[in-house]
Amino acid sequence: MSTSFENKATNRGIITFTISQDEIKPALDQAFNKVKKDLNVPGFRKGHMPRTVFNQKFGEEALYENALNLVLPKAYEAAVAELGLDVVAQPKIDVVSMEKGQDWKLTAEVVTKPEVKLGDYKDLSVEVDASKEVSDEEVDAKVERERNNLAELTVKDGEAAQGDTVVIDFVGSVDGVEFDGGKGDNFSLELGSGQFIPGFEEQLVGSKAGQTVDVNVTFPEDYQAEDLAGKDAKFVTTIHEVKTKEVPALDDELAKDIDEEVETLDELKAKYRKELESAKEIAFDDAVEGAAIELAVANAEIVELPEEMVHDEVHRAMNEFMGNMQRQGISPEMYFQLTGTTEEDLHKQYQADADKRVKTNLVIEAIAAAEGFEATDEEIEKEITDLASEYNMEADQVRGLLSADMLKHDIAMKKAVDVITSSATVK
């Protein structure tokens, strides 16, 4: 193989490479064995035409396209490796010459990874909007949330108040015409929960069981049902019951009902304090890591970020997100219908952060390279074991999904992140 690289612009160039006859001949044999199965030529059983007859009838050139598809990926990868290029997008391949008995000559228009000029990434001083401290109020708030979860609804006489639950029938109409989805029977609605459109729940405060209330509202301009967006509507609402929350007493019995591992309210609060401290510690460390990485990226200079890298990142993120949705049984069509969004909206959402994500990855990779980080066999095995445990998979399944190169890359990236964050201090 002969190879050359011609630089055309920053991070862009053309590879010229050849594919030798030693590679072409077996590829032509494979291509012939593939196509002959479907050949039905008079004088020969289907799939049994000799190669010489095929060449006479169709010409060896008829196999070139299939043969090229077989040999091209390996040849292109070998050319990139020989030239020591770091290619970051799909190449544009063109055939220069494919003459019988001669090496094939091709070109590949490629985009290469941009140069990263690192700035300071160690001993960084960062500011974070996070704290490890847990206040008594935060502990009490957690207890109160659990206490409210054990509250029981009891029917009450008198007017409905904010926080009460009303059991209602309702029929909605616009200009006197009922609309789809605007009707409900025996619906339990907590006043103040924000379940219904703005203004609806407030108009039921002060109502009593047995009353019928005309609730007049205006649908928001951005309402997902476009035929209703911005329109005035009336909901004829009948109140069947008004229920209020009866919360249990704040005592040791409540603590035992919430958590069978404790005996007193003080024990419950102590347990919650430890849980909150642990969660806050993780959140604080994450905040420091994020701030330190962001500063390291800001201190670096990336020479002309190729738009192809950003484009690929957008589609990678979108595909990952939609794949997660489908694993939960939600198709793309269902997701867009439920959220009132479009594929274009999702694309814009990921586009906004793609540039930042690509730059961050490039800088972390550059730090890993500058530090000479590599992964040992022991580290790779530990990573496989950890991933298998995290995703409830067998180790061999992980090995089948992730190549050794991917695992080595991830481990080196983690080491680079650790270098940035372990030396960072908080202002």
Curated annotation (Swiss-Prot):
Query: What Enzyme Commission number(s) apply to this enzyme?
Result: 5.2.1.8
Fetch the SUPFAM superfamilies from UniProt: FKBP-like, Triger factor/SurA peptide-binding domain-like, Trigger factor ribosome-binding domain
| GO biological processes | 'de novo' cotranslational protein folding; cell division; chaperone-mediated protein folding; protein transport; protein unfolding
- Membrane-crossing ranges are none
Its recorded reaction(s) are: [protein]-peptidylproline (omega=180) = [protein]-peptidylproline (omega=0)
Ranges of residues in domain PPIase FKBP-type: 163-248
- List cellular component terms (GO): cytoplasm
Query: Which Pfam families does its entry note?
Result: FKBP_C (PF00254), Trigger_C (PF05698), Trigger_N (PF05697)
In which compartments does the protein localize?
Cytoplasm
Q: Please list the GO terms describing molecular function.
A: peptidyl-prolyl cis-trans isomerase activity; protein folding chaperone; ribosome binding
Q: Which UniProt keywords apply?
A: Cell cycle, Cell division, Chaperone, Cytoplasm, Isomerase, Rotamase
EC class: isomerase
Q: What does this protein do?
A: Involved in protein export. Acts as a chaperone by maintaining the newly synthesized protein in an open conformation. Functions as a peptidyl-prolyl cis-trans isomerase.
Record text about domains: Consists of 3 domains; the N-terminus binds the ribosome, the middle domain has PPIase activity, while the C-terminus has intrinsic chaperone activity on its own.
Q: Which family does it belong to?
A: Belongs to the FKBP-type PPIase family. Tig subfamily.
The record's NCBIfam families line, in alphabetical order, gives: tig
Protein's recorded name: Trigger factor
Native organism is Streptococcus agalactiae serotype Ia (strain ATCC 27591 / A909 / CDC SS700)
Q: What is the gene called?
A: tig
